[in-house]
Amino acid sequence: ANYAIKSDTTSEEQVEFIASYMRNMFRLVYEACVKNNYLMFDEEYNLVPASYDNCKDTIEAVMDMDSVAAMYLVFEIMRDQDGGEGSFYMCVDFSEDSVYPKLTFLCPWDFSWTCYGEATGRYYASGFDDPSFVEIYGDRSNPWFILLGGEEWFMDLVRDKWSGLQKDAGAVYACIEAE
């Protein structure tokens, strides 16, 4: 995966740490979702066996799942064909008083193929791109959402978040109208 670092402090050591952290984070999610192999970070942010016995606890320990569910919904609502693995901002801050102690999905930055084509009733965020799209534009499937979209506990979280948003639809529409 390729990520752009948006920070004023990016020494070579920091860039290497961030690259390693993101590789390990994705591996942790993959291992938990696909292989039922539960890992965690040690003090040096290396992966080690975890004491967790399920995928949900393993991933929730290191990712802000509410933010992931929110981002999933944004890409699903927009039918974004370009959801890719990095079409949104993510952050994590390991400082003592951090607002983002877990990997947090913040906001999208790239909607170059939103609302592409006719709605087909399929999932967009957690699905592989349609072969005809891939043939022309390349595969822009989102591996984070594909892995998590296969987890019932995550989809329950997404459904709950969607239900909550529907209850507050008036506030959403008012915000849109204000813009």
Question: Can you describe what each PLM-predicted range is?
Answer:
Residues 84-140:
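Catalytic activation segment of kinase domains across protein kinase-like and atypical kinase folds
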Residues 21-28, 32, 71, 75, ...:
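Generic, well-ordered alpha-helical scaffold segments in large soluble proteins
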Residues 1-78:
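ATP-dependent phospho-/nucleotidyl transfer catalytic cores
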Residues 61-69, 80, 97-103, 137-140, ...:
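Secondary-structure capping and boundary motifs in well-ordered enzyme cores
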Residues 35-39, 80, 88, 171-175:
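Surface-exposed patches in mature extracellular/periplasmic domains of secreted proteins
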Residues 39, 43, 86-90, 179:
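Short, surface-exposed, charged/polar-biased interaction segments
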Residues 115-179:
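Hydrophobic, secondary-structure "cap" segments at the distal end of domains
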